[in-house]
Regions:
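Predominantly soluble domains enriched in secretory-pathway, periplasmic, or organellar proteins
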Residues: 1-398
């Protein structure tokens, strides 16, 4: 459960690395330009989705983990997840998977073990505010609930968050919640009851209560928020908060997420911290319950120095502790920070050109000392981008 799956974006592969030994376990073929990796609830299966709509499943419990099935779900896709619920309503662990497509705009429910397509549901819909029909209402992010047999599916152009009940896929129930338009990435709060998602071109975070199945709030944040799945912190003053970075400005902003014990801070921006330099460019922000830090990347900033830097904040004071520049021998941008299972290491990809693998690497930093402790290199390390720890991803720890 400390394996790390690393997307090798432009060579159409995913590398599986042992997070303890740092040794390469296998490299598997995938769809084109894999967007994300997700794991089944048991941790046995690794799911990938390419931007070409090809989904693959890797069995991590094989002696040498490898691809066991693939399916073409559409022509353009971004999201995939599995069923994670086990409780009074049934045992759905590893039973289903779901893919969200850009084109055609639909979601596809799959058998979680074989990827056999079971149900296709169109997401063409109406905009929640102007009531205009949108044929290309694309599926952005998808997350799986731990408390109910349902997926949270974000319909980008319509501004709707769909709660898709998979307890009976022959007659699925869908709660369509009006939120805000141009929904993109998002993640759970610490309780996994509330889902927070960026409506990035509206500079808004939409928050849904998945228990009550209703919109809680639309909270204005900075310019073009891009949280990935965000970062959850138990703050000494504000209680549980969830944080995002931004593509359009240099701030980290955090929203209170505890309406019971900290109602005065709930659904408000309670922290606004600034990073050095002009502009944003942040794609990912990450922390871990065992870590005192927040790590932030800025690969899409216009300044080459900031593209190649990582920013580390104290998660209680939100003071900048370090701006870490990657070694000069590597040519590329620092992208996607990810903790190991124990929360004492931070992995980051150095994303460069496809034909220059010798100038790219996966760097591993000690979260306590903030020093570089390991460099993973080789001819196979070509265009590394996202990397996903098995345990943290299947448990939604971020």
């Amino acid at each position: 459960q400390n394996f790390m799956a690393v997307i090798l974006r432009d060579v159409v592969k995913v590398a599986i690395i042992d997070g303890d030994t740092k040794e390469l376990v296998n490299i598997v073929d995938t769809g084109f330009a894999v967007h994300i990796v997700r794991y089944s609830a048991s941790g046995r299966y690794l799911y990938t989705i390419g931007r070409d709509g090809k989904a693959t499943i890797v069995d991590l419990w094989m002696k040498k983990p490898d691809t066991v099935a693939e399916v073409k779900t559409c022509y353009d896709a971004r999201s995939i997840d599995s069923s994670k619920y086990k409780g009074p309503k049934g045992d759905f662990l590893d039973k289903y998977a779901i893919v969200g497509c850009y084109w055609p705009p639909h979601m596809v429910i799959l058998d979680g073990n074989t990827l056999e397509p079971l149900k296709i549901i169109s997401t063409s819909s109406y905009t929640y505010d102007t009531n205009e029909f949108v044929r290309e209402a694309r599926v952005a992010s998808i997350v799986a609930s731990h408390h109910d047999p349902e997926w949270v599916v974000n319909i980008k152009e319509a501004g709707q968050i769909w709660l898709v009940d998979y307890s009976n896929i022959r007659a699925p129930k869908i709660a369509m919640i009006e939120a805000e338009r141009f929904l993109h990435d998002g993640g759970w709060d610490a309780s996994k009851r509330y889902f927070l998602v960026a409506a990035n071109f509206r500079d808004t975070i939409s928050i849904v209560d998945t228990k009550e199945k209703k919109l809680v709030a639309n909270v204005k944040v900075g310019r073009i928020p891009h949280p990935g799945r965000g970062a959850n912190i138990d703050h000494p003053k504000y209680g549980p908060i969830w944080c995002t970075g931004h593509l359009g400005d240099n701030t980290i902003q955090c929203i209170g997420t505890d309406p019971v014990k900290h109602p005065q801070y709930a659904w408000k921006v309670v922290v606004k911290a600034e990073m050095p330099g002009e502009g944003g460019g942040t794609l990912f922000i990450k922390t871990h319950p065992k870590s005192p830090h927040i790590w932030v990347d800025r690969p899409l900033n216009n300044d080459p120095k900031l593209q190649r830097s990582l920013f580390v904040f104290d998660k209680n004071t939100f003071k900048l502790k370090a701006q870490i520049e990657i070694p000069e021998k590597y040519a590329g941008r620092a992208v996607h920070v990810e903790y190991n299972r124990n929360g004492d290491e931070v992995w980051v990809s150095i994303w460069g050109k496809k034909n220059e693998p010798q100038k790219q690497a996966i760097l591993i930093y000690d979260d306590k000392t903030l020093k570089l402790k390991h460099e993973i290199t080789g001819d196979w390390v070509a265009t590394p981008t996202g990397h996903f720890n098995v345990y943290n991803t299947m448990k939604d720890i971020y």
